[in-house]
């Protein structure tokens, strides 16, 4: 049987951090190029599951809420029973962990592709080697979708999130957000070192330009949203919450998004919303969205320890983020808005 004629269902086991889950759509697109007739499902946490609804080429998401710190063997057996009933021919296991490979193995999926990782002999039966030779995270992931031995291409298909026409507008109306030009701010991130702290001042300046400002994030950003609203005034709205679909639709409806290096940055870019990514301790080469950014914002000063990729600044000055003034970010946002054709009052 030729690869193009294969119709067996295929399972992708992605990383479950939001940004990495979005990158997983590149893997789906590569698989669809290789096997256009194979249905593709993705495992997803409850948090990430809404993303699947906007990923072309994904048949369905299978919710998989396993605790991060335990193997949860009983839950693995329950998941394996679900997978077995779907008759998958292949599982592409992106994470390197034991835990990510257990259920596909218990389900008896014939082809289980992945890097050896945590010595997963037996759990993974189509091993791949050379992971350390691949420079970027996306190269390591998407290479698993290619036939073994295929050279890694210089460019990959970019992730795409497609919100149906009218859905974002209906969401905007339902939330009473009006029709004015809006900037979405995503001030959160995993790791304090990646958080730019001048969002309140940026919100104030954006509001003075006559722009609506939406604060997007999870429940952990509620206090920060209140601080941003206090600085920015009535044009600023708190849209943080527990439902990621809310964040997806907000990013789809906004004229521009300003984000730290976080999952919401990847969502905005994959939606096609002009996105500004603020980078301090992390490298845009390794972690910026494949889709490209309308602006990559970094400090203009030389910071010898940058990038450190540490979750907390060990120098205790956080200069890589502190030396990016709000006025610079807002000026860049004004240019991005103008290029996008959005009206900006000065």
Language-model features: locations:
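Catalytic machinery of carbohydrate-active enzymes
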Residues: 1-346
């Amino acid at each position: 049987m030729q690869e193009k004629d294969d119709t067996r269902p295929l399972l992708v086991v992605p990383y479950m951090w939001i940004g990495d889950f979005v990158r997983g759509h590149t893997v789906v697109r590569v698989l669809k190029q290789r096997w256009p007739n194979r249905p593709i499902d993705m495992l997803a946490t409850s948090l990430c599951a809404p993303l699947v609804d906007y990923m072309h080429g994904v048949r369905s998401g299978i919710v998989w809420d396993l605790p991060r710190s335990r193997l949860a063997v009983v839950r693995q057996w329950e998941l394996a029973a679900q997978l077995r009933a779907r008759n998958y021919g292949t599982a592409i296991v992106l994470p390197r962990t034991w835990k990510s490979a257990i259920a596909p193995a218990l389900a008896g999926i014939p082809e289980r592709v992945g890097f050896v990782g945590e010595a997963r002999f037996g759990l993974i039966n189509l091993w791949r080697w050379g992971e350390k030779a691949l420079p970027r995270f996306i190269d390591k992931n998407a290479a698993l979708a290619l036939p073994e031995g295929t050279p890694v291409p210089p460019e990959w298909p970019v992730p795409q999130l497609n919100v149906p026409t009218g859905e974002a507008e209906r969401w905007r109306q339902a939330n009473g957000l009006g029709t004015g030009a809006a900037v979405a701010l995503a001030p959160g991130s995993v790791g304090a070192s990646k958080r730019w702290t001048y969002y309140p001042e940026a919100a104030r300046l954006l509001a003075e330009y006559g722009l609506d400002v939406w604060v997007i994030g999870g429940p952990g950003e509620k206090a920060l949203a209140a601080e941003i609203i206090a600085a920015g005034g009535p044009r600023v709205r708190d849209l943080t919450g527990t439902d990621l679909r809310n964040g997806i639709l907000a990013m789809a409806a906004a004229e521009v998004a300003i984000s730290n290096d976080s999952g919401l940055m990847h969502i905005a870019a994959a939606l096609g919303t002009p996105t500004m990514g603020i980078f301090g301790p992390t490298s845009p080469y390794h972690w910026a969205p494949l889709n490209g950014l309308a602006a990559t914002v970094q400090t203009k000063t030389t910071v010898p320890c940058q990038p450190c990729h540490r979750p907390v600044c060990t120098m205790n000055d956080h200069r890589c983020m502190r030396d990016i003034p709000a006025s610079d970010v807002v000026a860049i946002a004004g240019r991005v808005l103008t290029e996008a054709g959005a009206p900006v009052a000065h």
